[in-house]
């Protein structure tokens, strides 16, 4: 059967490290995340932005012939407020927020912390990619038109952070070394990456080499074994 999975970026994320004038005596920067709709065998929304973006999400769903009740899974790549703000719209969906999988008061046990992927359906898999936070996840989508698309959340801030790693490091990382592992793993399996705060981009061989070259030999073994594990389960 042909793969019907389709990836639509309904909002392209952005971020700035420029500190603006104080508001209510607090300095601030501006950011919002990429929000992605996956349609096909399952309907999935990934990273639901802030609570002030409700209308944008509802209009985007309507433009794709969907309502919140048509969504099977709502996924937040991690628990920060710009990635979870409209999860409450999707009360008929299973929710995955970082390593936590839940419906109402049911919390499903899955060993993301052991490096094991969670398969939603054929060609749709959630993998653990910690680093930005302790329990980041990425969504791996196999498509006919784009190959393998990885929705990576803030493991990648934007394409430019491959050549300028100070970009992602300055945006916060609980474990930079672990985040480097995750970035290399994602690049190894992706044809396209949707970063947390920038446009979708195509992964080149040069990018893969760049992301791997600073890893120690021990981390290369880890990255290879983890990538092989994903291949074995069909990621």
Each predicted region: which residue ranges?
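Zn-dependent metallo-beta-lactamase
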Residues: 1-41, 187-189, 205-210, 223-235
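Beta-strand-turn-beta hairpins that frame and shape the catalytic cleft
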Residues: 2-7, 39-43, 117-125, 143-148
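Active-site-proximal loop/helix segment associated with metal-binding centers of metalloenzymes
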Residues: 18-20, 29-32, 97-119, 158-170, ...
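A short catalytic or substrate-binding loop motif that flags glycine-/basic-rich loops and adjacent residues
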Residues: 28-31, 130-134
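Active-site HxH/HxHxD metal-binding segment of metal-dependent hydrolases
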Residues: 30-32, 49-119, 158
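Active-site neighborhood of phospho(di)ester-bond hydrolases with catalytic His/Asp-centered motifs
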Residues: 46-49, 72-80, 96-99, 127-131, ...
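Metallo-beta-lactamase
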Residues: 59, 88-133, 135-233, ...
């Amino acid at each position: 059967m042909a793969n019907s999975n389709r990836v639509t970026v309904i909002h392209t994320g952005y971020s700035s490290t420029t500190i603006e004038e104080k508001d209510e005596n607090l300095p601030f920067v501006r950011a919002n995340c990429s929000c992605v709709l996956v349609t096909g065998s399952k309907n999935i929304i990934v990273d639901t932005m802030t609570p002030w973006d409700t209308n944008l999400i509802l209009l985007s769903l309507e433009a794709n012939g969907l309502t919140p009740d048509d969504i099977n899974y709502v996924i937040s790549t991690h628990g920060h407020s710009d990635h979870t703000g409209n999860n409450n719209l999707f009360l008929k969906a299973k929710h995955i927020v970082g390593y936590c999988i839940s419906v109402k008061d049911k919390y499903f046990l899955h060993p993301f912390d052991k490096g094991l992927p969670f398969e939603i359906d054929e060609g749709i898999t959630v993998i653990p990619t910690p680093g930005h936070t302790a329990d980041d996840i990425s969504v791996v989508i196999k498509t006919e038109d784009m190959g393998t698309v990885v929705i990576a959340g803030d493991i990648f801030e934007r394409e430019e952070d491959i050549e300028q790693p100070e970009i992602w490091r300055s945006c916060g990382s609980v474990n930079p070394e672990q985040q480097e592992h995750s970035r290399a793993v994602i690049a190894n399996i992706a044809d396209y990456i949707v970063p947390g705060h920038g446009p979708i981009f195509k992964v080149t061989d040069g990018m893969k080499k760049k992301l791997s070259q600073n890893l120690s030999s021990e981390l290369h073994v880890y990255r290879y074994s983890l990538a092989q594990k994903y291949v074995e389960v069909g990621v």
